[in-house]
């Protein structure tokens, strides 16, 4: 986020200026009393700080450093699959985009670790990751490679290829009825924390920068932390979740 710097020029006063102030009495300045409840919120001007940093037009490029990547954000869906126009408040925040530039990588121990995501790749990233910037009237995001959930080469989330220590899970269907036979609505259904692993990342990096394979594999039924990861819905209506391997609590069999 761009920082705002405020500067003030030094104030100088001549002897004549000081003389002109002679005779000023404190009683000449009066303040009216303020009764409780008389101050309206509209009398204040709010300072709004946006999350996006605006890059001046004179700059022609942005080069991410270290293990960061620059992503051109995919525009939010303005319509549903049925063609219904969505108001701005109902449009979901995009979690995808195209990698347009990458940093030089990072060093772990004595090993140099390059960015594994190439430019041009279509990616899915963590929902609240990175810093948003506006460049050439287009929204971009600068984030760390570790904030990238996976690569998505199609329009269906089920084809996600997770990166690093991410595990991609198809969530088990929620119970439609209670034990007593009462039909549950979508809002009252309890979110399942069990699912089937459909894809895993290559692994996490150890202290020397070497890849350590994940302890779960494709096809495993797992129990995971209830509030972890990023939730997605496939085109067929199925629910998916992408989370870190450390959020998988157990393998069920």
Swiss-Prot record:
It is found in: Plastid, Chloroplast. It comes from Arabidopsis thaliana. InterPro entries: Chaperonin_GroES (IPR020818), Chaperonin_GroES_sf (IPR037124), Chaprnonin_Cpn10_CS (IPR018369), Cpn20 (IPR017416), GroES-like_sf (IPR011032). The modification Phosphothreonine is found at residue 212. Residues 60-153 are annotated as: Cpn-10 domain 1. Seems to function only as a co-chaperone, along with CPN60, and in certain cases is essential for the discharge of biologically active proteins from CPN60. Required to activate the iron superoxide dismutases (FeSOD). Involved in abscisic acid (ABA) signaling, independently of its co-chaperone role. Acts as a negative regulator of the CHLH-WRKY40 coupled ABA signaling pathway, downstream of CHLH and upstream of WRKY40. Ubiquitous. Most abundant in leaves and inflorescence. Low levels found in roots. GO terms for cellular component: apoplast; chloroplast; chloroplast envelope; chloroplast stroma; chloroplast thylakoid membrane; mitochondrion; plastid; thylakoid. It comes from the Eukaryota. Residues 159-252 are annotated as: Cpn-10 domain 2. One of its GO terms (biological process) is protein heterotetramerization. Homotetramer. Forms stable complexes with CPN60 in the presence of ATP. Interacts with FSD1. Interacts with CLPT1 and CLPT2. Interacts with CHLH. Interacts with SPY. Changing residue 184 to A: Reduces co-chaperone activity more than 20-fold. Induction: Induced by heat treatment. Pfam families: Cpn10 (PF00166). This is 20 kDa chaperonin, chloroplastic. GO terms for molecular function: ATP binding; copper ion binding; protein folding chaperone. Signal peptide: none annotated. Keywords: Chaperone, Chloroplast, Phosphoprotein, Plastid, Repeat, Stress response, Transit peptide. Residues 1-50 form a transit peptide. Belongs to the GroES chaperonin family. PROSITE patterns: CHAPERONINS_CPN10.
